[in-house]
Amino acid sequence: MTTKQAGLGLLGSLALGAIGVALLGRDGHEPLSARRRMLDALALPPPAPPPLERLRAFGAGAAPAGRLTRWLGLPPSPAVSRASRVQAARRLNRSAGLLASAVLLDSALEHYRGSFRNPAMYTPLAVSVLSLAAALHGTGDRRSGRHPFRTAVYAAATTTGLVGTGFHIYNITRRPGGFVWQNLFYGAPIGAPMAISLAGLMGSAAEHVRDDRPGRAPRIFGLPAGRMLAALSSAGILGTVGEVGLLHFRGAYHNPAMFLPVTMPPVASALLLNTALGPARRDRWFTRWWLRLTALLGFVGVGFHAYGVQRNMGGWRNWSQNLLNGPPLPAPPSFTGLALAGLAALDLLEDEPHA
């Protein structure tokens, strides 16, 4: 590779990084005012009811989402402001859109390489296009409340990823030897379909967060939305690291930069898990900045993968072959999408620690 080509590759990586910074900076989170924070900090929670009253409320038909909270004697979760709720939902829509875009391009390349020999291989393309459209619609929608089209599309995306994982597992098991390193390296990527499921889950979470019910904080599956999102983002990042680690191990980590996506994102995953399970704190500045670095890593990774395509015989002049055989260009932004979801979780928890 010539010096000129290396320079072009570096400029491309910097340009992609600039795009990532612009995306992260767009529509940034505006925390509550200092006066509101001080009043919230001074406010005392209502006294817990006696144990007998808690037991009676738990078994007397109280709302399922609030039974455990009442039984433990925890204070009820105050409602998050509508503006903060919609803002977090739009960030989740951007997360779902990035994941859907990565799935669309990656599955198109990989399934084209497989000659679409199974008609089901067209399904992730159609579903990811619909998911991207729903994400774009949600990003531009400043209203609260669920949208039936987006809700249906995200549910279909979640189901598609689960079914696709079954297809990929079947592809591996039908090869000689079954689950051996050779088949895990060169068979259908076992973790890839879960990316469209993550897009669907993030989009569904956005609809839950948007759902405007006065007097209560947003909840997902009956649990506080902020903590649930942090846990979901943590699991998604960790699963993506596993897939990346397998493929970079196949590449023998010949470039030291290949260690970055298996070292930085696990820290982000651990920080988000601490956010989900740890004590309620308003200031998680280190977690926020580490998530921003993880998001930036997704864009910079595209530049490294473009350099990997250039290293193959013929470089970009032989793009029709090297795009199929080189490192997948659309894969790294999955980290960006999941980091954005983690940032949305932090936004909710900063506005209201019980959300």
Regions found by a protein language model. Name each.
Residues 1-355:
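Short amphipathic, positively biased membrane-proximal segments
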